[in-house]
Design a protein with these regions (language model features):
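Helical element adjacent to the flavin cofactor pocket in flavoenzyme catalytic cores
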Residues: 91-149, 153-162, 322-330
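A short coil-to-beta-strand element that immediately follows conserved catalytic motifs
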Residues: 42-43, 120-121, 172-176, 271-283
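Flavin-binding catalytic cores
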Residues: 209, 221-285
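Central helical "cap/lid" subdomain
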Residues: 144-196, 206-211
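Glycine-rich FAD pyrophosphate-binding loop
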Residues: 1-2
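C-terminal catalytic lobe of FAD-dependent flavoproteins
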Residues: 259-339
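Dinucleotide-binding Rossmann-like beta1-alpha1 core, especially the glycine-rich loop
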Residues: 6, 10-89
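Helix-loop-beta segment of a Rossmann-like dinucleotide-binding subdomain
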Residues: 40-50, 75-118, 136-137, 308-316
């Protein structure tokens, strides 16, 4: 899900109303590049446009936002990419996409080099017992795992897992989202375009692949649910609000919204950049902070129980902001040393 929820390593350029998110992204930008530089694709031109109608941010506000955050940009004639009168302003800047698979493999390789670490994937937790200041966790193969603390970083399942541990969850809503993978014409091959600030679209290179992703604020979320991730497709029994499955393996996932996204794209974009071709869809359940509905913030949420057995729950708003967890992990290690 994380790969779908954050397919771009952005600088925060699409959050002009989310200054706190931008601050955090910029704070950890260089650290992420240092740690995962091999995953980053910066070899394309990134364009950001302000829509002429129904944008929540205008030209002067967006330029003030970029200047305030020391983000370099140059203004470009909108007619080079867009149909007449569709956008108020167009900017060329530096942006990135990244390969989440490269990030994942690097982390897995790092874990494999560490002694006394066992990994379990695709494993369901059956029961959890709090005994003698330790957790006893029963997993579906009949084994028990005993530990002094738990870090819950399960993205869309964060509140589900917290409930298993009898811990409070975050105030969330859930979107069943679709990201389109598409083949683009040569005229768009090394270009990324984002239209703001409202129910518009973005088309960006997908890591180092030969494809682009196409997303739409209006069409990417198929269904919204709150306070639990409860969607009509779950009625078929492959998953439930208390046991989220892999949407991409599900036979009951929604029909694609590609045609609607393509139509929106072509309404804005100059005909010379038409001709995108559908390749596939990636579906996932995406958690959204209720508090961010108006501000568009994507802050990292962290809760910590400091009495044994210890428990940390984290929901990272953007891929590069997971470093916010550092201070909590250091505190947890010190607490464990004190036992």
């Amino acid at each position: 899900s994380r790969g779908l929820g954050d397919v771009y390593k952005r600088q925060g350029l699409h959050y002009p109303r989310g200054q706190k998110t931008v601050n955090t992204i910029l704070k950890y930008k260089e650290r992420f590049i240092h740690d995962f530089g091999e995953s980053i694709n910066s070899q394309f031109k990134a364009y950001y446009a302000i829509a002429n109608n129904e944008s929540l941010t205008n030209k002067s506000e967006y330029e003030d936002f970029m200047n305030r955050n020391n983000i370099p940009y140059s203004e470009v004639d909108p007619n080079t990419l867009f149909n007449s009168n569709k956008v108020e302003a167009l900017y060329l800047t530096k942006e990135y996409s990244y390969s989440y698979k490269i990030v994942l493999n690097k982390l897995l390789n790092h874990i494999s080099d560490v002694k006394n670490v066992d990994t379990f994937s695709g494993t369901k937790v059956i029961s959890i017992t709090d005994k003698n200041e330790r957790y006893q966790i029963e997993i579906e193969n009949g084994e028990y795992i005993e530990c002094k603390g738990v870090v819950n970083a399960t993205y869309a399942s964060t509140n589900i897992v917290s409930q298993l541990f009898n811990k409070p969850g975050f105030n969330l809503k859930y979107e069943l989202c679709e990201v389109i993978l598409c083949k683009v014409p040569d005229t768009l091959k090394d270009i990324g375009i984002t239209v703001m600030d409202g129910e518009f679209f973005s088309i960006m290179p997908f890591g180092f692949s030969k494809y682009h992703t196409l997303t739409s604020v209006h069409y990417t979320p198929h269904t919204v649910s709150s306070p639990e991730p409860s969607f009509p497709c779950m009625k078929n029994g492959s998953c439930s609000p208390h046991n989220i499955g892999n949407c991409n393996l599900c036979l009951h996932k929604p029909l694609t919204a590609y045609e609607a996204m393509k139509t929106q794209y072509e309404e804005f974009i100059h005909p010379q950049l038409h001709g995108i071709e559908y390749i596939s869809s990636m579906f996932a359940i995406k958690p959204i902070q209720i508090s961010s509905e108006k501000t568009d913030e994507r802050n990292t949420l962290i809760q910590m129980a400091k009495q044994p057995p210890f428990y940390i729950s984290v929901l990272s708003g953007k891929i590069s902001t997971f470093y916010e967890l550092d201070s909590y992990l250091i505190e947890l290690i010190n607490l464990l040393k004190g036992l």
